[in-house]
């Protein structure tokens, strides 16, 4: 963490020395993160020294293959899995789509193979594969599922989250299971509220249910979690989570914009089918010549998380908590913390809040800010205009409060000095807006 400490000091020094009109403070780390210097170095070295095709036997190719293998090992270590269960993808969207498409294809394949039941009724005969998710998922889960439903390729149940704690309840997931259910996909942590979902409990309940289903001739239910927002901010271990699939997104933990997918017992215990066809790379599950420099960067980012994760988490939690203290001190009862729910844990870096007032819509406040760089919510929902976030509404946040929402997410180099600048910037932005009324 010495390098991180140096970066913190550098950031603090910049914040203190820069003239007020030129100071910019980035607090949108849930949207994306900058590359760590070590990541840039790993990528640059790969471009310079490992330019060969990883499938080739000459030195530059062997070097590329070695880098890819090391990166796979680092990713596995970060999540407590096995290297052979990790494949590289272009990013979280591809990983999520790959899971969904694979499970649907597997359902049809197994159902066709088991079509002849010797005159006995097949409990899923004629049924479409059924997938369960929740109402606050990322678009890379929600939209593929809506598309499958519109095309009548699958049936989908969107389970609402609790308006008390912002979580999806395991009991509600189990209640939605049907004979043709083949997948439950629930994000590990929400990108807008930071609320951590009870994925371990859901996995445990589904495993117990699967024992009964198999005995009754029903297909087993697989469990997937999109861990994009959790990785690099809290401990993530697939053994504790008990999932069959886990999505990894590099640019959320200071890595490059590629991703990976963990598949428990890839190809043996858990099915996976390629969406692309070509060469034999990634054991035919994801063909195409590997992007060695990006993979090198992803592996280095994972290595840093495995080595420094606890320190990263503690630092971000301290800065985030200080941010919420300062907001409360400055705005008093006008502040509504949209990401604090009783009985629910949340990411250590995320603060979603609203400043009450008829002129203080989140976008309007941010537009008046001269220092703060942030967003009102998920980057993929940037086209909502002044409409309140569907995620916050699903969590029970009132419409007038949700419309004023701002999401601040701190990072590894965020400082208390930057928090002070941001709160002062928000105070001045609010004063300007209310002065215009």
Curated annotation (Swiss-Prot):
Compositional bias (Basic and acidic residues): 7-26
UniProt keyword list: Acetylation, Cytoplasm, Lyase, Pyridoxal phosphate, Transferase
Residues where N6-(pyridoxal phosphate)lysine is found: 252
GO molecular function, one term: selenocysteine lyase activity
Pfam families with a match to the protein in the record: Aminotran_5
Cofactor(s) of this protein: pyridoxal 5'-phosphate
Domain of life: Eukaryota
Catalytic activity: L-selenocysteine + AH2 = hydrogenselenide + L-alanine + A + H(+)
Region (Disordered) residue spans: 1-30
Subcellular location: Cytoplasm, Cytosol
GO cellular component: cytosol
Annotated active site: 380 (s-selanylcysteine intermediate)
Modification type N-acetylmethionine: residues: 1
Binding partners and assembly: Homodimer.
Name of this protein: Selenocysteine lyase
Taxonomy of the source species: Eukaryota, Metazoa, Chordata, Craniata, Vertebrata
